[in-house]
From Swiss-Prot:
It is found in: Cytoplasm. Homodimer. This is Lysine--tRNA ligase. Its EC number is 6.1.1.6. Disulfide bonds: none annotated. It is an enzyme of class 6 (ligase). One of its GO terms (cellular component) is cytosol. Keywords: Aminoacyl-tRNA synthetase, ATP-binding, Cytoplasm, Ligase, Magnesium, Metal-binding, Nucleotide-binding, Protein biosynthesis.
Length: 575
């Protein structure tokens, strides 16, 4: 890497790296470093009246106070932080004091990984600490961390820019307290859910991510191409149709937690790559699934937070079962005053116009109803609420309602104004299913790019017979948002999808060389801030000369300085 592309701190750290190696200390050792304790456990288990406990710990050095022959550092391991007391004569018991005077005081930097062996004690200030007897260099940090400081409950030098935090999650996790806890809770959400399903005897399975037909949901898929088979494939938008095939095959209850992909917009609650859980249980219906779902979510909340109440933004949400149940058409009537029962597509289109909604000709009856609910109803349900009995046009994979053939046995759970999960009494009539798929194809011909494609193999599977079944899908990212009180999906994804990182545009060296500039001077000119030839057009030759010659001297590049006249000629040649 060109030295001019580095910051001053990065240059110093790389020099320290080389100096460590010159001393015979490998800054990235290969050998295992054995630890026997974590910071949090050391503090929790410490007793003043016991024999001092010998410990071996490892982590990042996050702060350092040097006071001559004695120093304090703060060591951060995977569970927390602990103070370490280091004295010259304890880590350098012999004549050679280089490990303290040179390595620790001068060549180590904040962010470096080190190992500490020593004993636990309480300082005169009452802080449980480790008295170091041996220090080992484990990994040198050659790029400075943004060290966040905390004092009296106040945060200083915070690393809080959302784009930087999401793009460099590794830094966010290292320096911001509480971020790691979100992802620890996420793991607990998964464990609790699996425990709930497994205790009922349901089996976790895996189904294809690359699919010949993108089915199981109304969404735009990502496409790819299989070179060996020379066929187009889709990244799955849902695992539903494959899981139902397993019910046909004889499994009574199956579930899958996995990635889905939808080629759609990104916002505070949507990421194109997301994690979904889907479960299907034979001989059940959507009424059973509502009770099953509310008990599951109550259990997860208790396991993760120790309570059924969670604060999300300004709202306190209580996940204690049972949850309120409201029909979709009932919700629309309550919030708009319009009863859509029995209305055809044109009548509903007129209602949309009266409500001043933006609609288009590609929207069928189901899509129009969905738009009305989304605009006027969805955001009002803060506490967990089951919205039930969706119109048949909205639910091509759902069984018709036993009491009203215009509706389906479907529910969505709304929490904090957003859909959390979606469930059905699954359609298992193959003739009805084929007709529903054909209706979807008509919507596709009208221009609805989210309409489902006919999956003939799935229909064939149903023809062999599928028992009455209920299925439910839940967005794991949104569930984690609720369980951790987060308002954006990016906060619960380690690495959310980001737009390409902005790069400062730079002209090639050849463009500068056309002005008569020697190639070795191009990085110097760009270091001075003139990344493109056009940036030099209005500059004062004297100032430009001072800038680039100053960089030559500062970085000891030993280049032959141009004259002010040379610089003036370069600038004159710019058209």
């Amino acid at each position: 890497m060109n030295i001019l592309e580095l910051s001053e701190q990065e240059i110093i750290r790389r020099n320290s790296l080389n100096e460590l190696r010159a001393m015979g200390i490998e800054p990235y050792p290969a050998a295992e470093y054995v630890t026997n304790a974590f910071s949090t456990d050391i503090k929790a288990e410490f007793k003043d009246d016991e024999t001092p406990r010998q410990v071996s710990v490892a982590g990042r050095m996050m702060s350092r106070r040097i006071m001559g022959k004695a120093s304090f550092i703060e060591l951060q391991d995977s569970k927390g932080r602990i103070q370490v007391y280091i004295t010259r004569d304890d880590i350098c018991p012999g004549e050679d004091k280089e490990m303290y005077n040179t390595v620790f005081k001068r060549l180590l930097d904040l962010g470096d990984f080190i190992g500490i062996e020593g004993f636990v004690f309480r300082t005169q200030m009452g802080e449980i600490s480790i008295h170091a007897q041996k220090l080992t260099v484990l990994a040198k940090s050659i790029k400075p961390l943004p060290i966040v400081k905390y004092k009296d409950g106040v945060t200083y030098d915070s690393f809080e820019d959302p784009e930087l935090r999401y793009r460099q999650r590794y830094v966010d996790l290292a320096v911001n307290e509480g971020v790691k806890d979100i992802f620890i809770k996420r793991s607990k959400v998964y464990s609790s859910m699996r425990e709930y399903f497994n205790s009922k005897g349901y089996m976790e399975v895996e189904t294809p991510i690359l699919q010949a037909i993108a089915g199981g949901a109304a969404a735009r898929p990502f496409m790819t191409h299989h070179n060996a088979l020379d066929i187009p494939l889709y990244m799955r938008i849902a695992s539903e149709l494959y899981l139902k095939r397993l019910i046909v095959g004889g499994f009574e209850g199956v579930y899958e937690i996995g990635k889905n992909f939808r080629n759609e917009g990104m916002d505070r609650t949507h990421n194109p790559e997301f994690t979904c859980m889907e479960i299907y249980v034979a001989y059940k219906d959507y009424n059973w699934m509502m009770e099953f779902t509310e008990k599951m979510i109550e259990k997860i909340c208790l396991d993760v937070n120790g309570t059924t109440e969670v604060k999300v933004g300004d709202n306190i949400i209580n996940f204690k079962a049972p949850y309120k149940r409201v029909t979709m058409l009932g919700a629309i009537k309550e919030h708009t005053g319009y009863d859509l029962t029995g209305m055809n597509e044109e009548q509903i289109r007129e209602v949309c116009k009266k409500l001043n909604m933006e609609i288009d000709d590609t929207m069928g009856k189901g899509k129009l109803i969905d738009e009305i609910f989304g605009e006027f109803c969805e955001g009002t349900y803060i506490q967990p609420t089951f919205i039930t009995d969706y119109p048949i046009e909205m639910s091509p994979l759902t069984k018709k309602h036993r009491d009203n053939p215009e509706l389906t046995e479907r529910f969505e759970l709304m929490v904090n104004g957003k859909e959390l999960c979606n469930a059905y009494s699954e359609l298992n009539d193959p003739i009805d299913q084929l007709e529903r798929f054909e209706d979807q194809m008509k919507l596709s011909e009208k221009g609805d790019d989210e309409a489902m494609i006919i999956d003939k193999d799935f229909v064939r599977a149903l023809e062999y017979g599928m028992p009455p079944t209920s299925g439910m899908g839940i967005g794991m990212d949104r569930l984690t948002m609720l369980m951790t009180g987060q308002s954006t999906i990016q906060e619960v994804l380690f690495f959310p999808q980001m737009r390409p990182e902005k790069v400062v545009p730079k002209d090639s060296a050849s463009k500068f060389m056309e002005l008569g500039i020697a190639e070795e001077w191009v990085p110097v000119i760009q270091k001075a801030g003139y990344n493109q030839v056009a940036d030099m057009k209005e500059v004062n030759p004297q100032k430009f000369h001072q800038d680039i010659c100053g960089i030559n001297k500062k970085y000891k590049l030993e280049l032959t300085n141009p004259s002010v006249n040379d610089v003036a000629e370069w600038i004159q040649k710019i058209k």
